[in-house]
A protein has these predicted regions:
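Charge-rich, acidic-biased intrinsically disordered regions
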Residues: 51, 103, 108, 133, ...
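Short amphipathic alpha-helical signal-transduction/dimerization elements
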Residues: 36-37, 41, 132, 151
Length: 171
């Protein structure tokens, strides 16, 4: 379980990462997820990687995106990134990434720009295809571009005045 209570991101009993913290969260994710991609491309080259479960997640993401079920979509997007890490068979990578995923989802729920047409399932699909192509450079560009777009889709000028119910991010 994720604990935000002891972190400095709590303001009046409500978690709210700042712009700088959000950018740092994504910077840390890039460092970890680039390692994930490197391992997965190598495993795929050695025929040691089964991506059927990940393919299924992306298909579910696409169908939920069309139904606009944001809570389930957010959960699936989190599951996608953690599932990729789990395919590395390295508990330290998974445990390093685990707290960052919900923190980035929390930031997205606070700073979401409703004008943005960001669509993660297409980038998730492109990332999987890059891994399947055994092209590490292409796969690294795909994950970096995806995480950069996640940050670019946020509007840090928004005032977080709504009482966000973010419980779905931590279930």
């Amino acid at each position: 379980p994720l604990r935000l209570v002891g972190s400095e991101m709590c303001i009046r009993d409500r978690a709210k990462p700042t712009e700088i913290e959000t950018r740092q969260i994504y910077e840390a994710r890039k460092a970890i997820e680039n390692s994930v991609i490197m391992i997965l491309v190598q495993k795929h080259q050695n025929n040691e990687l089964d991506l059927r479960g990940i393919d299924s997640l992306v298909k579910k993401e696409k169908s939920l995106h069309q139904d606009t079920d944001n809570a389930k979509l957010a959960r699936l997007s989190c599951d996608f990134h953690l599932s990729l890490a789990e395919l590395c068979d390295n508990k330290f990578i998974v445990e390093s990434l685990k707290p960052l995923i919900p923190l980035s989802a929390l930031a997205a729920s606070i700073y979401a720009d409703n004008e943005s047409n960001f669509c993660s399932f297409t980038e998730h699909f492109e990332l999987i295809e890059a891994i399947k192509s055994n092209d590490l450079v292409k796969a690294s560009k795909a994950i970096n571009s995806h995480l950069d777009r996640c940050v670019e889709s946020l509007d840090f000028n928004l005032k977080a005045t709504k009482n966000h119910n973010n419980s779905h991010l931590f279930n």
